[in-house]
């Protein structure tokens, strides 16, 4: 397993007093499941089937890392296994990036669009699986990231091979976040042995509390 370096950071932003169903983090707003916009999507019958039922905290670990270490190339971004898409939404809002939000489950996109609307941005939706992402799909991508995307044994190879293709395609920065599941570390071992990179321990406290690890590869 790659060695972990642990860094602790604190998010000081406070949730809006006007809306207790929202959290604020690094300049974006994140709705709880009880927020009216999320309830409206659920009432419309959209039910994600691959764990896309909430905002996962590994996305916040990635946002915090990117906030502190902004890549030079950040115009075009791919959010792989996006779920509700908050990391890509943050990139669109913070940097004005063109974001492609990718997920195998089309039912996540109404939720993502609701979150994007709350933040005053939009992203391009792409229904796709990791193993189907081709090298040519990645050739114009500056940053590829994914939060909580390696949660099953059968995802280890597809995620690792997607990263292989991203590196071959010249993607500049790759960041994968996870609460340190064994499957994440198995994938990270495969990738770092082949391409280098590092696994960083990362922690947030404050408005969002989260602990996990980030696989970071710089390919510029």
Locate each region found by the language model.
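S-adenosylmethionine-dependent methyltransferases
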Residues: 1-220
């Amino acid at each position: 397993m790659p060695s972990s370096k642990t860094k602790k950071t604190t998010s000081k932003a406070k949730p809006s007093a006007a809306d207790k169903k929202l959290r604020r983090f690094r300049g974006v707003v994140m709705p709880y499941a009880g927020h009216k916009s999320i309830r409206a999507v659920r009432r419309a019958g959209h039910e994600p089937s691959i764990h896309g039922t909430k905002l996962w905290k590994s996305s916040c670990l990635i946002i915090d890392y990117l906030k502190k270490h902004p890549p030079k190339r950040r115009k075009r971004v791919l959010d792989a296994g996006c779920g509700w898409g908050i990391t890509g939404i943050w990139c669109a809002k913070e940097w004005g990036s063109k974001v492609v939000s990718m997920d195998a489950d089309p039912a996540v996109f109404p939720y993502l669009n609701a979150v994007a609307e709350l933040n005053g941005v939009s992203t391009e939706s792409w229904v796709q699986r990791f193993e189907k992402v081709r090298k040519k799909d990645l050739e114009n991508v500056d940053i590829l990231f994914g939060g909580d995307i390696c949660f099953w044994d059968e995802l280890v190879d597809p995620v690792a091979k997607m990263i292989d293709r991203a590196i071959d395609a010249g993607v500049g920065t790759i960041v994968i976040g996870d609460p340190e599941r064994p499957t994440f570390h198995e994938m990270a071992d495969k990738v770092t042995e082949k391409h280098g990179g590092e696994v960083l321990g990362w922690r947030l406290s404050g408005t969002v509390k989260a602990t996990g690890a980030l696989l970071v590869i710089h390919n510029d």
